[in-house]
Amino acid sequence: MDHTFSNRLLLVPLFQGFSRLDFLDIVEKTPFDFRTLKPKEIVVRQGDESHRLCILLGGEVECESESPEHTYRIKENIRAPWVMQPDCLFGLHNVYRYTVRSLVESQFVMLDKQSVRRLLMQYPAFQINFYNMLS
């Protein structure tokens, strides 16, 4: 197992509070999709459907939200570690509320919705951390 990856993942609030065995079990059994994005690459667009949980492990992104009337935009810069819009993954309106664009070379790990659902069912610590992020 790559210790750099596991150390970065442990900094993410979703993965805090796990026993070493549970954490190793998660890393072993969960299909993580790793991506490195170049500056100005778009991660997700506002209005697109959310099919996966995106976690920024390294780098910096810009979040841009446009009003429904297209009269104004709000931009915010966010650095790693960060879990991107977890509230959009499940629920009535599972679309992204803002566009996320990489500002510098950034490392992401993506978890599909099915994997997140499995983690929520099997690991109480993950479930508590996920609910804390939503509140």
What is each stretch, according to the model?
Residues 39, 79-80, 112, 134:
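A secondary-structure boundary/capping signal
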Residues 41-104:
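Cyclic nucleotide-binding regulatory domains
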Residues 23, 95-99, 114-135:
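A small-molecule sensor/coupling module
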Residues 106-115:
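A short hydrophobic beta-strand segment most commonly corresponding to one strand
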Residues 1-38, 88-91:
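Cyclic nucleotide-binding regulatory module and flanking cytosolic helices
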Residues 26, 64, 86-87, 118-119, ...:
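Residues that scaffold the ATP/ADP-binding catalytic core of kinase and kinase-like folds
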